[in-house]
Amino acid sequence: RCKESKPGKNGCRGIDDKHWNSQCKTSQTYVRALSKENNKYVG
């Protein structure tokens, strides 16, 4: 996720600031991928 209200060290915050650098677009795509995988496990 890219939250402008609470910018991290690189301007973007996610599950882990170390892995979620300043690439908001990449992080959002990664979140979608994780969400799809989680849906498979849940459903």
Curated annotation (Swiss-Prot):
A GO BP entry: neuron projection morphogenesis
Superkingdom of this protein's organism: Eukaryota
Record Gene3D superfamilies: Cystine-knot cytokines
GO CC aspect terms: axon; dendrite; extracellular space; synaptic vesicle
Keywords: Growth factor, Secreted
PROSITE patterns per UniProt: NGF_1, NGF_2
Compartment(s) where it occurs, according to its Swiss-Prot or TrEMBL record: Secreted
Main location as per UniProt: secreted
Primary role: Seems to promote the survival of visceral and proprioceptive sensory neurons.
Protein name listed in UniProt: Neurotrophin-3
Taxonomic lineage: Eukaryota, Metazoa, Chordata, Craniata, Vertebrata
